Regions:
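Membrane-anchoring hydrophobic helices of lipid-metabolizing enzymes
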Residues: 2-135, 170-172, 179, 323-332
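Active-site metal-coordination segments of metallo-dependent hydrolases
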Residues: 58-59, 160-165, 224-227
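Short, flexible loop segments at the rims of nucleotide/cofactor-binding pockets, characterized by
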Residues: 107-113, 160, 179-184, 219-221, ...
Length: 334
């Protein structure tokens, strides 16, 4: 009986995830049936109502209170509801990712997307050099990878699959249909990412989540750990680093912006400073979040002070007994 309990305890989450696959696919089918705008509105409405009762809402509220200490509780809770609305909309929009990016420069008024910095996409595509792009969980954060593919930019997006099997399978299918290269974050992923850059390709990564083995930077005035991969690659290959963000407009419409290459700080030897480079990227992300705080993923435990590296304390010099003894001998002989 004990052995059976241990087996069930180990495999129950996976079994539950597999059992959820039909339900998730039914919801996906329903979202497609509703159409883009109705699905987005419905997903947002459900998340606004359900989200505040979920455990993750406590994380969102704590993060918002720390980031905006000057705001009252009503404003904090309103921002949390906006964040839930954005998350619900983004989830529902997965059913329409293949058609969501429908930009037509000849008829911009009728399109769901507008793009600023298209010339940077084209420059990255045509310069024959590798390039790096950082992003954040803002608005519908899947759209930059789709935009790159539509502009003919060979790019590989680094992604972290959802925890539950049902969502992970469905999201992977949608991403394969709409995006360029994909690389799952993990232990062995660094080598494949390095290979992308060595071949002259382009790599995109979301940098606004906790990374245990990361470097320390400041985000909203508090220390956080960030994955240093992009800075290390920029240092090694001397390739440009751009930022990309999405801003949600009304009725499932979006504005996408690709920044010019960042001027990253360098050390005394003229090489890119990894910690300084990640701080520069994180500063850009903070500016984006401050512009549209209700469109960021506040439910993530971005600040984890107990996981920060302990400050190094210089060892206290112990007195040398032999020196004291020599001093005593000298004073006696004098």
């Amino acid at each position: 009986m004990l052995r059976l309990a241990l087996v069930l305890n180990r495999h129950l989450p996976r079994m539950a995830g597999i059992a959820m696959i039909p339900l998730v696919r039914c919801l996906f089918w329903l979202a497609r049936l509703l159409g883009t705008e109705r699905a987005s509105r419905t997903g947002g409405a459900i998340a606004r109502r359900v989200g505040p009762f979920l455990p993750a809402n406590r994380i969102a509220l704590a993060n918002l209170r720390a980031a905006y200490p000057e705001e009252d509780e009503a404003a904090i809770r309103a921002l949390a509801r906006q964040a839930w609305d954005n998350l619900g909309r983004t989830g529902a929009e997965y059913a329409h990712l293949a058609t969501l990016f429908d930009i037509d420069p000849a008829d911009p008024a009728s399109q769901r997307m507008s793009v600023a910095g298209a010339e940077h996409f084209e420059a990255l595509r045509d310069d024959g050099k590798p390039g790096l792009i950082f992003a954040a969980h803002l608005a519908n954060w899947e759209l930059p990878a789709i935009c790159a593919a539509r502009y003919g930019l060979e790019a590989t997006a680094i992604f972290r699959p959802p925890n539950d099997i049902a969502s992970a399978r469905l999201v992977a299918e949608v991403r394969r249909e709409t995006m360029g290269g994909l690389a799952a974050a993990g232990q062995g992923a660094v080598f494949s990412m390095q290979g992308v850059v060595e071949r002259g390709g382009h790599l995109g990564q979301l940098i606004d989540q906790h990374f245990t083995r990361g470097v320390v930077v400041e985000f909203f005035g508090r220390p956080v750990l960030v994955n240093p991969l992009l800075a290390k690659l920029a240092k090694h290959y001397e390739c440009p680093v751009h930022g990309v963000r999405v801003v949600r407009k009304d009725n499932a419409r979006f504005h996408l912006e690709l920044t010019p290459p960042l001027d990253l700080p360098r050390d005394a030897k003229g090489e890119i400073d990894v910690q300084g480079a990640m701080q520069a990227m994180t500063r850009v992300v903070e500016e984006w979040v401050r512009e549209n705080p209700g469109q960021w993923l506040w439910m993530h435990r971005r600040w984890r002070p107990n996981m920060l590296p302990k400050p190094k304390v210089a060892p206290v010099k112990q007195p040398d007994p032999s020196a004291a003894h020599r001093g005593n001998v000298t004073s006696v002989s004098g």
